[in-house]
Amino acid sequence: MELAVMSPVLNGMGTLEAALEYLHSLGVKSMELGAGGYPGKALMDPKEFLGKPEKIEALKALLAKYEMNICAIACHGNPVHPNKELAKDFHDQFVDAMKLAVELGVDTIIGFSGCPGDCEDSKNPNWVTCPWPSEFSEILEWQWNEVVIPYWKETVKIAEEIGIKKIALEMHPGFCVYNPASLLRLREAVGPMIGANFDPSHLFWQGMDPCEAIKVLAGAIYHFHAKDTKIDAANTAKNGVLDTKHYRNILDRSWVFRTVGYGHGKDVWNNIISTLKTVGYDGAISIEHEDDLMSSKEGVEKAVAFLKEVIIYEKAGEMWWA
């Protein structure tokens, strides 16, 4: 396993080199590079590099200068948005990000499954969370069979032509893929290029046990986000977990995102890392900071210190005791 940081956390540093220098000073040797979509292009805009071999070589030299590996390219978006212009923009950015990944020797691209509307004439996405009244079940089947599955079948073909090996979709509420069952549904329909970007922060508040979810997804986990969630037991007892209050309304929300260790303790994270290792995942553990109680810098540094104690870096030796 390797410790990584998702670059949008460091967008405020202004330049990619400043972010690389900072991570190098922390002993971090891997970066998840944001290059479009919701992560933005503050530190990396693929269009500035694609078709320009000299700029690609300069970028590789910059990464080598700070001993930095790019573990994946992040370009989360909603490529099946009912607004066709938005959908095309998200799709085009995703394709550019895939092309950049291959130029840099990176085989994994990260995104969202997306969420369509409820019909061809919709203006906004419609995330279905219940089967009744029956219209919701009908909407869900239309979304999957007419939009999501066809879109990803075509996008996988494009990815294969470009040279991408893995599409790691983040299981995120608000999108059609939001838990292991929906991730596996898409994977079974489209093929093994589709896998999970496993972010336990989105599973904690839905009531899932990340370790059990990891077991269900064994062999289909292509990336991992290290982000925590703090559940407010009192607010959850009163209002449940479907909470639309702003994330800054910490006192009244049922849950909020936290830096690793501030939602769940070391034992929980030890078990998550151990379960990942058990199912054969040996890739990046990428820090994502969305904690409104501390700065990005403090959050990253606390997460780095915490995870250095938790991550299993080496392969297990011979079982000499058995």
Which ranges hold each PLM region?
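A short, acidic, flexible beta-alpha connecting loop/helix-capping segment that sits on the rim
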Residues: 10-11, 286-295
